[in-house]
Amino acid sequence: MSPFAPFDAQTQVLLIDDDPHLRQALRQTLDLAGLKVATLDDARQLDTAQCKDWPGVVVSDIRMPGIDGMELLRQLHEQDADLPVILITGHGDVPLAVQAMRGGAYDFLEKPFPSDALLDSVRRALEVRRLVLENRTLRLALAERHELHGRLIGRSAGMQRLREQVGSLAAIQADVLVLGETGAGKEVVARALHDLSSRRDGPFVAINAGALAESVVESELFGHEAGAFTGAQKRRIGKFEYANGGTLFLDEIESMSLDVQVKLLRLLQERVVERLGSNQLIPLDIRIIAATKEDLRQAADQGRFRADLYYRLNVASLRIPPLRERGEDIPLLFRHFAEAGAMRHGLTPRELDAGQSARLLAYDWPGNVRELQNAAERFALGLGLSLDDGVLPDAADEPHNLSAKVEAFERSLIAAELERPHNSLRSVAEALGIPRKTLHDKLRKHGLPFNTPGENPPDDGE
């Protein structure tokens, strides 16, 4: 017996009863009331896994062969605990119906019952269902909004606009072009678009076209058959095919050769992929999110990028503002990354003083969020407020030479270990992997007191 799935948006009432005369009479009543009805004579035909978020009502007899109304109620509520189920009982089945109500049934009707009683119960159940699903939608929207705030951090107008755009584009299936400088967070945006979409349970495949050698880029993206070229000893599934059913994030798309761009354009238009060495077209159900740090329009004008591919990609685009355009977000982001870094290493979070905060805002951040994250994590480790290109201006309290940096790092590690729960110098020394006397010498050198009741300095011979 093949499963029957009437759980579509058009069906309002699913009626299940093994008595053909009663089933026909009840259907006629519901039809005349303008309700869209589907009927079954056996609950075993039903695919209950499809009922989640269905906007309708189930009306079922309790006494049926195979799966009775009580078992059906249990199976439906395993999938959606709020689905309204109205049970029909015969004379003498009232105790069973009361048990069903306690088990989550919406209502029960004792035979014989007037048509108005059925219609009234169904209409009330439909209204309750509408409100439940509306509430679910609102809660989901709030949860997604909260998740977006956690991923795309910032109070600036640019970030607020970006979050709104991501939320809107996540709900549709269109391919997206993400524009942003190096380190701006293009993959973070792409991942958010995937995770908030209907494809969230499918694969998310990220590939950087700029990191692929010209000789392997086509094989990596489109795949190949055994013998397609020298060295192709077995079939390879390409990234596009691997991402089928999900999302493929293609970064640095501007680095692709014109020949590969032609193949990508065909894939975007026809939604098929052809492995190297094969004539078979493989259908794809895929969303492509491309990203670039360049002006593709200018690249197209210069002949470095296909104009038709640019126009095909630029239907839906997002621009991530560089960090220098959203200075108000810098302290917030720095604190977020510094606290995360401290937590990861088991350290107590450090606080920026006013001077350090001012230096953060004065810096241009050419590496954007990636550079800021690196600086914040170094700060969390006690390595000072420095960048890849050197110490920030006015950071006179930070070490400049290698020896001083090593000393500062050693001090930060010991200080961090001292903040952990220890009851003796010996346990601290063991945690650091050094003798207790060495630890005592370093505590004295770095000015780090450690006072434990009964703890005495080690003897020279220890």
Curated annotation (Swiss-Prot):
Residues that, per the record, bind ATP: 180-187, 243-252
A GO cellular-component term linked to this record: protein-DNA complex
Keywords: Activator, ATP-binding, DNA-binding, Nucleotide-binding, Phosphoprotein, Transcription, Transcription regulation, Two-component regulatory system
Domain of life: Bacteria
Name under which the protein is recorded: C4-dicarboxylate transport transcriptional regulatory protein DctD
GO BP term, pick one: phosphorelay signal transduction system
InterPro entries given in the database record: AAA+_ATPase, CheY-like_superfamily, Homeodomain-like_sf, HTH_Fis, HTH_TyrR, P-loop_NTPase, Sig_transdc_resp-reg_receiver, Sigma_54_int
Domain Sigma-54 factor interaction: 152-381
GO molecular function list: ATP binding; ATP hydrolysis activity; cis-regulatory region sequence-specific DNA binding; DNA-binding transcription activator activity
Role summary: Member of the two-component regulatory system DctB/DctD, which regulates C4-dicarboxylate transport via regulation of expression of the dctPQM operon and dctA.
Gene this protein is translated from: dctD
SUPFAM superfamilies per the UniProt record, alphabetical: CheY-like (SSF52172), Homeodomain-like (SSF46689), P-loop containing nucleoside triphosphate hydrolases (SSF52540)
SMART domains reported in the protein's UniProt record: AAA (SM00382), REC (SM00448)
Short name of any one Pfam family annotated for the protein: HTH_50
Posttranslational mods: Phosphorylated by DctB.
Gene3D superfamilies according to UniProt: 1.10.8.60, 3.40.50.2300, Homeodomain-like, P-loop containing nucleotide triphosphate hydrolases
Residues annotated as domain Response regulatory: 12-126
Modification 4-aspartylphosphate occurs at: 61
